[in-house]
Amino acid sequence: MRGTVLAEGIGEKLTPLPPMPKCQILIAKPPISVSTKMVYEKLDSCEIKEHPDIDGILDGLKNQDLEQVAASLGNVLEKVTVEAYPVIAQIKECMMEAGALGAMMSGSGPTVFGIFRDRRTAKEAFTKVKAQNLAKQIYLANVHNVRRR
């Protein structure tokens, strides 16, 4: 399956969604590795108070509202991983200070992505993350999906 999808269950149920609005995505992986097992073990003992705003993301996609998509991001694993690896929070903060509409850890970490409206701002964030030696690998991607027929 191609394009934007909603994954449910353990990823086995995929539902096609409207495309992601045109944007730039900055991806930064710090020079660490994270044990997914450790994250899930600690998650079980952690109280989860906030959950991703799935409805907000779905509405943002439907309305092609990039700000709403970015504002609705959430990852319940992030709290656990950031406690063990504060560099993840530093990367997010750097991206947000550089103009990201939203930034979030991907999966159980350690990779962080930031959503940017334009390439200039995303490149500035790329330069800042690199200058602070926060990430070992940094990539900039252009998202420009076309609507499904």
Each language-model region and where it sits:
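Conserved, helical-rich catalytic subdomain that frames metal- and/or nucleotide-binding sites
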Residues: 2, 7-102, 117-120, 126-130, ...
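Conserved SAM-binding loop
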Residues: 104-105, 114
